[in-house]
Amino acid sequence: MGTYTPLIYNIYNVHIWVFTESQGQIGQMSPRGKMETAVSQGQHKQLKDGHQHKGRKLSEEIASLLRLKECRRLNPASYYTPRRTSQSQSLSGSTFKEYNEYINEKDSSRAQRQNAAAVLSKLAHDFWENDCVIDEDIFEDSSDEEQS
């Protein structure tokens, strides 16, 4: 493997490494999935000299070099199976139907418990608000009342 100089340019999210003459590679993929184009030291010198004579920035020269180089981006759709457009249609008759019904039952029982807790808390608040007084009205509906 050849060595490279630490001159790295980032133009249009494309890393450009300036390699020495002994390196024969033209391009690599970076670990992050970005395309990297290797420019030989001679090409780098030509670009730099061209920059001095033409008055253009080195980054513009490298960008024009990249535009001339044929690059194509792969279409990821060809590597993945297509998804259905509506998930509600796929879940209606699926194997998860019983599980979803169980979850809905669990949620409804939770809501019932929350409602019961709210009613109990209101009754307790009313009880303490009335200075813990128990009226005879509480026992009106009781079946243990004495018959007169």
UniProtKB/Swiss-Prot annotation:
GO cellular component, one term: cytoplasm
Sites bearing Phosphoserine, chain numbering: 59, 86
GO molecular function: cyclin-dependent protein serine/threonine kinase inhibitor activity
Alphabetically ordered keywords of this record: Cytoplasm, Phosphoprotein, Protein kinase inhibitor
BP GO terms, sorted: protein targeting to vacuole
Localization: Cytoplasmic granule; Cytoplasm
Induction details: Regulated by phosphate, probably through its PHO4-binding elements in the promoter.
Disulfide bonding pattern of the chain: none
Function: Putative cyclin-dependent kinase (CDK) inhibitor necessary and sufficient for PHO pathway-dependent down-regulation of low-affinity phosphate transport.
Miscellaneous field: Present with 2180 molecules/cell in log phase SD medium.
Designated name of the protein: Putative cyclin-dependent kinase inhibitor SPL2
Species in which this protein is naturally found: Saccharomyces cerevisiae (strain ATCC 204508 / S288c)
Name of the encoding gene: SPL2
